[in-house]
Amino acid sequence: MNINKIALIYNHNSKHLAIIEEIKKLYNYCKIEEAEVIIVIGGDGELLHNIHRYMHLNIPFYGVNLGSLGFLMNPLDTKKLLQNIHDSTVSILNPLLMQVADTNGQIYTALAINEVSIFRKTNQAAKFRIEVNGIERMNELVADGALVATPAGSSAYNLSASGPILPLESNMLCLTPICSFRPRRWHGALLLSSATIKFEILNTNKRPVNATADFQEFNNITNVTVKSTKDKPVKLLFNKNHTLEDRIIKEQFGG
């Protein structure tokens, strides 16, 4: 991949400003709208926020890890930064499209790279009904919540909720309960990425529920519809010896 124009994004309040200033001195940067690659310095959260902000530009993202985990990031190598980008591999991520309705009758939509989650707002467990492709699959799930995760997001919140890790090219989604109370032994489902999942919230007055698409939250919802969309693909660049697919495989073996 031959790259001549790169843009640099970072948190100006970062504790790593000395490192960032060093990177800035080594290379010439352009405006984000003119870039062939957007470099994001920080952690997974910084990258996700900027993907949401600039994904409409259809420019590949290259993350440089200065955070804690950095699952979607590349290790810092100041001197070889451009060479690593030139030699990088591309992973295509298809986000989730979430549509929610709230108790005031308002309809909202949002995109998620990692997951869409719904969760109880009070100390009482949430109750909801689940449909897949218009067919009722569970008439009542009692739990702290539930989530739908993409393959890229399956090793994040989904894994913490005891959901499975999906290979990046699997064309599947994880439907995972969060602290399921009833049915107690239900651990979720693996669905084709073409599936449309709908959650209908039961008893919304007594058991209010919120929903999030990655970090964007909606309050007091009555129903949520989730499906994968190929209309807004996201291109992430990874070092050739440190691909996202390799990381997902490694994570399954406790790496």
UniProtKB/Swiss-Prot annotation:
Domain of life: Bacteria
GO biological process assignments: NAD metabolic process; NADP biosynthetic process
Catalytic residues identified in the record: D44
Catalytic activity as recorded in UniProt: NAD(+) + ATP = ADP + NADP(+) + H(+)
Intracellular or extracellular location(s): Cytoplasm
Main location: cytoplasm
GO molecular function terms listed in the Swiss-Prot or TrEMBL record: ATP binding; metal ion binding; NAD binding; NAD+ kinase activity
Keyword Cytoplasm carried by entry: yes
Positions of NAD(+) binding: D44, G45, H49, N114, E115, D144, A152, S155, A156, Y157, N158, L159, S160, Q216
Cofactor list: a divalent metal cation
EC top class, as a word: transferase
Keywords per UniProt: ATP-binding, Cytoplasm, Kinase, NAD, NADP, Nucleotide-binding, Transferase
GO cellular component: cytoplasm
E.C. number(s) listed in UniProt: 2.7.1.23
Family to which the UniProt record says this protein belongs: Belongs to the NAD kinase family.
Function field: Involved in the regulation of the intracellular balance of NAD and NADP, and is a key enzyme in the biosynthesis of NADP. Catalyzes specifically the phosphorylation on 2'-hydroxyl of the adenosine moiety of NAD to yield NADP.
NCBIfam families: PRK04761.1
Protein name in the entry: NAD kinase
Organism of provenance: Rickettsia rickettsii (strain Sheila Smith)
Source lineage: Bacteria, Pseudomonadati, Pseudomonadota, Alphaproteobacteria, Rickettsiales
